[in-house]
Amino acid sequence: MKKFTILLSTLLGICSLALVNAQTNINTGAISGKVLDEKREAFPYATIGLLNAKDSLAIQGTLTKENGQYEFKDVSMGSYLVSIYVVGYKKVFKGPYELNSAKSKIQLEAVQLVPDAKQLQGVDIVKQKPLVERQLDKTVLNVENSTLAVGNTALDILEKSPGVSVDKDGNISLRGKQGVTIMLDGKPTYLSSEQLANLLRSMEGSAIKSIELITNPSAKYDASGNSGIINIKLKKNSNFGTNGSVFAGSGYGTYYKANSGFTLNHRKAKFNVFGNVDYGRNKRFNSLDIYRVNNTLLDRTIFDQTSDNIRNRNNSNYKAGIDYFLNDKNTIGFVFTGYNSNGDSQADILTLIGSTPAVGDSSVVGKNLSDSKYTGQTYNLNYKSSIDTLGQELSIDADYARYNGREVNAFDNLYFAGGQQTRAPYLFQNGTPSVVKIWSGKIDYTYPLQKDMKLEAGIKTSIVTTDNDYRFLNFNSGTNQWENDVTRSNQFIYDENINAAYLNVNKKFKGTSVQIGLRAEQTNSKGNSITESRIVKRDYLNFFPSVFLNQDLSKNHSMGLSYSRRIDRPDYGSLNPFIYYVDLYTYQFGNPFLKPQYTNSFELSYSFKKTLNTTLGYSRTSDVITEVLLSDTAKKTLFISNENLATQKSYNLNISSPLPITKWWSTNNNLTVYYNRFESPSLANAPYESGRLSFNFNTNQTITLNSTTNFELSGYYVSKQVYGTLLIDPMYAIDMGLSKNFMDKKLNIKLAANDVFNLRESKITSALPSQNYLVKQKWESQVFRATITYRFGSNNIKGARERSSSADAEAKRVKSGAQ
C-alpha cells in the first residue's frame, strides 16, 4: 500500500508541474490565421511554416486544424514570414509581420488557396484506405468502405478480422486466446461476454469506421484482458455545419429480419452536438443437440436430447453527446449511451433416455419459455487540455453506469415410457433479476521531456456493486400457484474497488522506437452469498510492466519486440455459487473461489514493405479461468462451471499479407497458427493436460467493377482446437457482398449474403477421457440482406472527439446478458 501511495503522489506532483510549465512567457507573442480552399471552405491539415524575415530560415511549423485555423505561440519578438503549402495548390508566402511589445498578437486575414493545374496533372489522389493496415502497436481493419460492412453485424465483422474467432455463444478469441477486452471508441462497453455478444449482434456494420486489434497493450490501458484489446471505432462525421445519414435494411434466413437507424452531427464554432440511434428486429432459429453417456459401475445410461429454439429480439442502441470548446486548447464534453434489449424464446426439447443409442426406454418432452429485458445507461463527463504546442496534454474522465436485467425461464416437463405418461408433469421457473452499478474516474497526462521523448502518466479508480437475486419457483398443482423454493434461491452481492496508476516513457532514436511502462493495480473485493451466509474477501496489489521496441532495419524492413503482463478477473456473475438450470438435466453454477488469471506475453514482429507482416508470440497464463463441462454420475446430469486450471502455454505465428493483384483486384489474407497447452494437477480428481496445434485463416477479395461498384468475397476457416476440457470441431463459412453508389456517393445500396452455403455449425466433445458427450449447435447463419443508406449535409463536418473513458476493465465483466 505504501508503494502505491508513493506512486500516486508522484503522479499528482507531475500533473501539478504541468500546470506550472503551462504559464506563457510574457516576452513572446503569437501569430494566427486561417486557410480556405477554392470554395472558401476551411482547409484542414495544410502545412504552415513560420520563417525568419531576414534569411527565410524556418522557425516553427504546424498544420491547420479541422476548422482551417492555425496558431504559432511563444514566438520571440521580431520580423516573420508565413508560408502555406499543400500538394496540388500554389504555395503562398505572406508578410513580413512585426512582433513587438506594442503588438504581441497578430491575426492574419484568411488565405484562399488556388489549385495548381501543373501539380494536379502528376498527382493521383486515393482516398480509400486498404482493408487491413499494420501499425506499430496494432492492426487496423478499415471497415468503412467494405461492401460487407453493411448487411453484417459488428459480431459478423469481428469474425472476419485477422486472428479473431467467435464461438457459438459469441465469445471472442484473439490468436487462439480468450479474455479479450472490447472497447467502443475507446470507451468501455460495461458488458459481460453474453451481453456483449447481444450488443454486437444488434450493432449494424454500417456504423463502424474501423476495428483496432491491439495484442500487446501498453501500461496506459487497463491490465485486464490476457489476449489484448479490440477497439471498435464508430463513424464520425471537419468544418462547421450539419450532416448525418439514415439507413434501412432487411434480411431473410429462416425468418425475416429488419434494421434501421440514423446519425446526426452539428458543429458550430464553440460546440459540437452528435447522436445516433439504431433499431433492429431479429427472429432466428437455433437447434441444439446434446448426446451424453453416463457410466457407473452398475449401469450405462444414454441421454439423447434435441432442442429447437425460436428467438425473437428487439434491440435499440442510442448515443448523444456534446463537446464544448472553451478555447482552442480546452474542451469539455458529455456523452450518454444506452441500449434496450427485449426478447422472448420458445424451445421444444425431446430427451430420450435408455441404455441403447437411438432407442429410449423413456422420454421427457419439455417446453422452455423465456422472457427477458435488459437496459443499460452510461454517462461520461470529460475534459481535455492541450497545454502547449509541444504535445503536453491533460485528460480527465468521470463515468457512471447502471445496468438492469431481468430474465424469466419457465420449464414444462412431461414424462413418458412405452407411449404412456408415467408421472405428473414437473413445472418450474427460474428468474434472474440483476442490478449493476459502476462509478469510475481517471486522469491521463502527457509531458514531452525532449523533442523525441515523452512521458505518459495517469491514475484511475473504479467502484462496482452488483446485486443478483436468483429465484427458483416450483408449481404446486394442489394450490395451482407458483411457490418459491428457498433451497434453490439465492441473493448474491458483490463489491469491488480497483485503484490504478501508470507511467510510460517513449523515446525515438534514428530508426528506433522504445517504450517502457509500469502499471500498478490495487484490488479490494467482497462476495456475499446472502442465502448461504458466505463471504469471500480478496485484497491484492499487482504490478504490470510493459516494454516495446521497434527497429527500422532498412527502407523496406523493420522488426519489433514487445512484452507485457496482464490480468483477467472473473466475471461478476461467475462468482455467484448458486445453481442456474439450463434444462432438466443441464445446469450451471458459479465459483466464489475463482482467482484472477495472470498472463506474461512476448511478441517478435517483422514487416516487409508494410505488406508482408509476421508476428511470433508466446504467452504463459497461470490460474487459467476455464469453462468446464462435467457429469454428475449419481444424478445423471451435466453441469457447467468455471475453474482455475493450473497453466496455459500459448505459441502463435501470425502472417498477414494485403496485396493488390491488379488495379481492380486486391486481396488480404491472414493466417494464424497456434498451439495452446493446458496443464492441471487435479481436475475431476485426476491430473489433466491437453494441447493441440490449430490454425485459422481469413481471406478477403475485393473487385472494383467500376468507379461506383465493388464486389467482395470473403471466407474463414478455424481448424479443430482444444480449449481447456473442450475439443471443438472446425468451423468455416463463405460470405459475399455487392455495393453500388448513386448521387455522387450520397446514396448507397448494398447486397450481402452471409454463409452462402450454410456451412457454419458448432460441434464440441470432451477432451477428458472420463467424459463422453457431444454438443452440436446449428444456428441461422445463412442470411441474405439488402441495405440502403442516404447521407445528407456537408461531407466535411468534424465529428465527436474519441474518448477513452475510465472503466474499460469493468466493461466485459457484467453478467446476466441475453443473446
Please provide the spans of the model-predicted regions.
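Short acidic/polar hinge/loop motifs at secondary-structure boundaries
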Residues: 73, 99, 187-215
